[in-house]
Amino acid sequence: MPRDNMASLIQRIARQACLTFRGSGGGRGASDRDAASGPEAPMQPGFPENLSKLKSLLTQLRAEDLNIAPRKATLQPLPPNLPPVTYMHIYETDGFSLGVFLLKSGTSIPLHDHPGMHGMLKVLYGTVRISCMDKLDAGGGQRPRALPPEQQFEPPLQPREREAVRPGVLRSRAEYTEASGPCILTPHRDNLHQIDAVEGPAAFLDILAPPYDPDDGRDCHYYRVLEPVRPKEASSSACDLPREVWLLETPQADDFWCEGEPYPGPKVFP
């Protein structure tokens, strides 16, 4: 990559991502997909320092640095033939991918995971609400805690679905704008998240390290947070975080898909 002082900000971000995530290509494989509570895979020497530098660069990034004009909100409903989310590909190596997701008004990227991956998300315009979660697994080859027989949900689950329910934890739910620092995920912390556009369109830069690769155990899985049936007299503590939740893996929703669109910003060179 060019090393002159006139390099664009996105070029410097890509260069720093190369340093931060070098050697991360290849991941940890499918057998580690559910190891959300185990020790984190060892990273290259200097990883914390390089990650801090990358976070600092991302914090500076704005939509105009990528020649992206903020989309305007519309009161018209989204036509059913248009994707709710689009993606601008910027750059990718075996170690990381770099691109921009653009969400239309009132749309969401459903709850999903990032097996064995680090991620960094920096809002470029608009506001997004990010709910961060993790699966709670026993580790050591043991099965995760089973769903108590008396636990019921609304709507009710089928017997096969009950067998697939897994415990999880909702760690945080916060809103991010272009003035916010990046949202960070690791293989074992905040690895699942849902992203909602709040009061209008939004866009964010996304770094995933290493990129998704189903052949190497890094496929994207979607989840639903189950709503437990609570006694009427039970006090609600839904706002208390972190809190335990029950998760059910689901197929990708029919009303969610993502299509590509051209990236208008400065080119990133190897």
UniProtKB/Swiss-Prot annotation:
SUPFAM superfamilies: RmlC-like cupins. Its cofactor is Fe cation. It catalyses: cysteamine + O2 = hypotaurine + H(+); N-terminal L-cysteinyl-[protein] + O2 = N-terminal S-hydroxy-S-oxy-L-cysteinyl-[protein] + H(+). There is a cross-link at residues 220-223 (3'-(S-cysteinyl)-tyrosine (Cys-Tyr)). It comes from Homo sapiens. It is an enzyme of class 1 (oxidoreductase). This is 2-aminoethanethiol dioxygenase. Its EC number is 1.13.11.19.
